Amino acid sequence: EVKLLESGGGLVQPGGSLKLSCAASGFDFSKYWMSWVRQAPGKGLEWIGEIHPDSGTINYTPSLKDKFIISRDNAKNSLYLQMSKVRSEDTALYYCARLHYYGYNAYWGQGTLVTVSAE
């Protein structure tokens, strides 16, 4: 059974940093592209980016590539999202996903909530 479990979310101040993690199990993690997707309150899904199985290629949504860094550790079956210079509009539920590729099914985690607030 494919499982994706995100962690690391929480409250962060504007301008701050946060690193999200995703633990994968139930499939050969090292063979798949992996993605991060987010959903802000009351808005649709927004694709953040994706990383090649060997980390050789990382693609980002252009507006986010200067503040988010996607990485992975195949030995630990883990995917990461380093967030920096966060703003209120980065408040969202962040999902780790193995999206559709070459006929394979898509799988999503439950998400981890990031709230950007000075309070």
UniProtKB/Swiss-Prot annotation:
Domain of life (superkingdom): Eukaryota
Entry-linked InterPro entries: Ig-like_dom, Ig-like_dom_sf, Ig-like_fold, Ig_sub, Ig_V-set, IgHV
Xref: CDD domains: IgV_H (cd04981)
A GO biological process held by the record: immunoglobulin mediated immune response
PROSITE patterns: IG_LIKE
CC annotations in GO: extracellular region; immunoglobulin complex
Listed Gene3D superfamilies: Immunoglobulins
A single MF term (Gene Ontology): antigen binding
Pfam families linked: V-set
Keyword Signal: no
Keywords for this protein: Adaptive immunity, Immunity, Immunoglobulin
Descriptive protein name: Ig heavy chain V region J539
